[in-house]
Curated annotation (Swiss-Prot):
It is a peptidoglycan-anchor. The lineage of its organism: Bacteria, Bacillati, Bacillota, Bacilli, Bacillales. Ca(2+) binds at residues 292, 297, 300, 307. This is Serine-aspartate repeat-containing protein G. One of its GO terms (molecular function) is metal ion binding. Residues 789-799, 818-878 have a biased composition (Acidic residues). GO terms for biological process: cell adhesion. It comes from Staphylococcus epidermidis.
Length: 931
């Protein structure tokens, strides 16, 4: 017998291959609301981060692909030839299988009538072709010895020494969940777990009479403890009604994720409304990823090793979602929730306290889950959810090895993709002995399992081929008797076997089922003697199991192929497969439900603190505040929110001892948080906007918060006509009406606009403390007066745009003044000289009216406010031109006055007028600079 390494090493040919399924019973894990629900169709594996994920948003909320259910197959119409213990069954010539030891090929021919695809349902009218006979020593003569801790196989021949022994032990880590630790994993929605394992072994023998041999099996220890069992399971039949998914006996711990119970076990505490709308547009996906079931993240999904795909998605539920509304989640079209059965149920989404947020149903055609929200969404706000979805390769869609897929998962309108390659294992071979097998279905209603076996898939010339199917395993058993259904199909020369080891249409192959070469053994087994073959064959075995057996914990069935290598010496080789479905429950199973874990509450009161002292009930006018949003944040970062009732009360239930939670109070509009931690009584003080609370074995109903109404303030005040242009309001100066005044925030955004009244007054009310900008629009035809004149801020002008800060008080000091643009008289003085050009507008109090021509080298540009009417025009290019200019003037009439005296008077008046204009011009220039 050849000893080979376990599947994990893959350094040498595999001695034993096994498919194992296991059911684990433990509680539905809770998710926070932020919910986390682990959506686990099948067995969960260790989590690994996605290697290459591409997230994209799509608008279509429905899957376009229509996929058929690969498991809806029936074999109720199949007919089997029968051989009973007490009688033989006549068959036609077409269904005879004649065995000739000297012929290299069997004449195995049979035409199957009305073949349909099989399931594990057993027709009560269907009989088997098995006949119980004494064990023939010339057939398979290996005796299996059970060893709990190791497995061995040996290879011996007349000229070959025995190979060294190898031992393979696979163990599963215990699954325990501490309720006191902060668990970022949102949920362990786990009610059961099913593991499938394949074990293959090769044996070489050189003698007909053999000593006992030990078949190499993979030994797997099962988890011994799970917490929080939520229902009593009285027998294995109930366990089998839980979902079933492939697994195998690789050496690695089991994840705490699992499959879900069957739909008949699903109950809803709060049923959603019957009517609702699809609200995918109100679901915001914040994170999603696809990871491989094993930790290698190599992009290869080992489908025969039950490696799965894990879809994680975190999303937020809009507060507009109501009870009865629905959202959708799509798994990839090339995957299935379970590879063994349709008896799975979608887990309910719950928060950490156990309240149900949504319930789900699955549409296999569209590969779509529809979640219906309960009235939970009507009670709570800011709901966040997390789903963990586990699925397996749909072998009906992916029959070939090394198939590359671009898988896509989608929640609501957001999808994520990942590229993977599907890998199937190769047959177990030992010289000409070569085979592979898998459990392909389990029927928990009729208590049957279906095993699909490939015999000689490599098309070797196999001499004296004998196949033994045994229900006696090291870890479990099936029932091989006259109720066992066995069908045999021959694969034609031009036909290929699917690499997936799954047959969905047996009618494509030649049915060669015959009773002559199949005989029941004495040890819960059956032998099928094929003789000499060189074609592949398919064996479909449907056998029963006993779910009520006291020590029944697993289903295991073994198939062994033996071929003769040397007809003269009797040397032969064997290759074996073990297929296992293991059932185990947590400790305490059968003793009733574990008592529920004690949980605690946090509350309690939000009030209006009229006297702003931070202590409740110190003022008769203090009252509760309703509709205040209060948020509880769990240790894992998830959260949920409620609003205070009409009495100002709030409460969060279902909180665990020893954990620390954060309570946050939203400040109501128009209110300000009061003082924190005032006084000596923590039950009457205020915690402020947020506080961390640790549960220490009791409820904490002292988490209160007080608020007082935020005072409102006003801003103004006056725009006046500054007749004296001094920038200070005078008693006789009047207000200007109709001036536009704009109030802005500190960023320049307009808050409000008003106009001054008939008295020049304006006012903005209901303002909070803060920074503001006041802008005055200058009236048409008026000029801004001097700003910030004098020492009284309430009497001066503040200018066109004023920055104002309000701090707990009104501000009625924001004023502005204007005067008319045309209040100045005209006085023009133009002077041209060699050195200067001067324009002078002067108003003086002089009553003179004179014209004079003068020479001037002054540089001046002046305006005066004198009231005289005096025009002085002087054009001078040089001193030589003065006499010439004077001569061109018309003479004045003779008034009888002294000519010299008049000339001197005129000259003196002109000098005074020029001096006055110069002084007044300088004054105006200074005022302009000041303005």
């Amino acid at each position: 017998m050849i000893k080979k390494n376990n599947l994990l090493t893959k350094k040498k040919p595999i001695a034993n291959k096994s498919n194992k399924y296991a059911i684990r019973k433990f509680t539905v894990g809770t998710a926070s609301i932020v919910i986390g629900a682990a959506l686990l169709f099948g067995l969960g594996h260790n989590e690994a981060k996605a290697e290459e994920n591409t997230v994209q948003d799509v608008k279509d909320s429905n899957m376009d692909d229509e996929l058929s259910d690969s498991n809806d197959q029936s074999s109720n119409e199949e007919k089997n030839d029968v051989i009973n213990n007490s009688q033989s069954i006549n068959t036609d010539d077409d269904n005879q299988i004649k065995k000739e030891e000297t012929n290299s090929n069997d004449a195995i021919e049979n035409r199957s009538k009305d073949i349909t695809q099989s399931t594990t349902n057993v027709d009560e009218n269907e009989a088997t072709f098995l006949q119980k006979t004494p064990q023939d020593n010339t057939q398979l003569k290996e005796e299996v010895v059970k060893e709990p801790s190791s497995v061995e196989s040996s290879n011996s021949s007349m000229d070959t020494a025995q190979q060294p022994s190898h031992t393979t032990i696979n163990s599963e880590a215990s699954i325990q969940t501490s309720d006191n630790e902060e668990n970022s994993r949102v949920s362990d929605f786990a009610n059961s777990k099913i593991i499938e394992s394949n074990t293959e072994s090769n044996k070489e023998e050189n003698t007909i009479e053999q000593p006992n041999k030990v078949r190499e099996d993979s030994i797997t220890s099962q988890p011994s403890s799970y917490k929080n069992i939520d229902e009593k399971i009285s027998n294995q039949d109930e366990l089998l009604n839980l979902p079933i998914n492939e697994y195998e006996n690789k050496v690695r711990p089991l994840s705490t994720t699992s499959a879900q119970p069957s739909s008949k076990r699903v109950t809803v505490n709060q049923l959603a409304a019957e009517q609702g709308s699809n609200v995918n547009h109100l679901i915001k996906v914040t994170d999603q990823s696809i990871t491989e079931g094993y930790d290698d993240s190599d992009g290869i999904i080992k489908a025969h090793d039950a490696e799965n795909l894990i879809y994680d998605v975190t999303f937020e539920v809009d507060d507009k979602v109501k009870s009865g509304d629905t959202m959708t989640v799509n798994i990839d079209k090339n995957t299935v929730p379970s590879d063994l059965t349709d008896s799975f149920a979608i887990p309910k989404i719950k928060d950490n306290s156990g309240e149900i947020i949504a319930t789900g149903t699955y549409d296999n055609t569209n590969k779509q889950i529809t979640y219906t929200f309960t009235d939970y969404v009507d009670k709570y706000e800011n709901i966040k959810a997390h789903l963990k979805l586990t699925s397996y390769i749909d072998k009906s869609k992916v029959p070939n090895n090394n198939t590359k897929l671009d898988v896509e998962y989608k929640t609501a309108l957001s999808s994520v993709n990942k590229t993977i390659t599907v890998e199937y294992q190769k047959p177990n071979e030992n010289r000409t002995a070569n085979l592979q097998s898998m459990f392909t279905n389990i029927d928990t209603k009729n208590h049957t399992v279906e095993q699909t076996i490939y015999i000689n898939p490599l098309r070797y010339s196999a001499k004296e081929t004998n196949v033994n199917i045994s229900g006696n395993g090291d870890e479990g058993s099936t029932i091989i008797d006259d109720s066992t259904i066995i069908k045999v199909y021959k694969v034609g020369d031009n036909q290929n076997l699917p690499d997936s080891n799954r047959i969905y249409d047996y009618s494509e192959y030649e049915d060669v089922t015959n009773d002559d070469y199949a005989q029941l053994g004495n040890n819960n087994d059956v032998n099928i003697n094929f003789g000499n073959i060189d074609s592949p064959y398919i064996i479909k075995v449907i056998s029963k199991y006993d779910p009520n057996k006291d020590d029944y914990t697993t289903i295991q069935q073994t198939v062994t192929m033996q071929t003769t290598i040397n007809e003269y010496t009797g040397e032969f080789r064997t290759a074996s497969y073990d297929n296992t479905i293991a059932f185990s429950t947590s400790s305490g199973q059968g003793q009733g439900d574990l008592p529920p874990e004690k949980t605690y509450k946090i509350g309690d009161y939000v009030w209006e603190d009229v006297d702003k002292d931070g202590i409740q009930n110190t003022n008769d006018n203090e009252k509760p505040l309703s509709n205040v949003l209060v948020t509880l944040t769990y240790p894992d970062g998830t959260s949920k929110s409620v609003r205070t009732d009409e009495e100002g009360k709030y409460q969060f239930d279902g909180l665990k001892n020893g954990l620390t939670y954060k309570i946050t109070f939203e400040t109501p509009e128009g209110y300000t948080p009061t003082l924190k931690h005032s006084g000596t009584n923590p039950a009457l003080d205020s915690e402020g906007n947020s506080v961390w609370v640790t549960i220490n074995g009791q409820d904490d109903m002292t988490i209160d918060s007080g608020f007082y109404q935020t005072p409102k303030y006003s801003l103004g005040n006056y725009v006046w006509y500054d007749t004296n242009k001094d920038g200070i309001q005078g008693d006789d100066e009047k207000g200007i009406s109709g001036v536009k005044v704009t109030l802005k925030d500190e960023n320049g955004n307009i808050i409000s606009t008003t106009t001054t009244d008939e008295n020049g007054k304006y006012q903005f009310d209901n303002l909070n403390s803060g920074n503001y900008i006041v802008h005055f629009d200058k009236p048409s035809g008026m000029t801004q007066t001097t700003t910030d004149s004098g020492d009284d801020d309430e009497q001066d002008a503040d200018g066109e745009e004023v920055h104002v800060t309000i701090t707990d008080h009104d501000d009625f000091s924001i004023d502005n003044g204007y005067y008319d643009d045309d209040s100045d008289s005209d006085s023009d003085s133009d002077s041209d000289s060699d050195d200067s050009d001067s324009d002078s507008d002067s108003d003086s109090d002089s009553d003179s009216d004179s014209d004079s021509d003068s020479d001037s080298d002054s540089d001046s540009d002046s305006d005066s406010d004198s009231d005289s009417d005096s025009d002085s025009d002087s054009d001078s290019d040089s001193g030589l031109d003065n006499s010439s200019d004077k001569n061109t003037k018309d003479k004045l009439p003779d008034t009888g006055a002294n000519e010299d005296h008049d000339s001197k008077g005129t000259l003196l008046g002109a000098l005074f007028a020029g001096l006055g204009a110069l002084l007044l011009g300088k004054r105006r220039k200074n005022r302009k600079n000041k303005n």
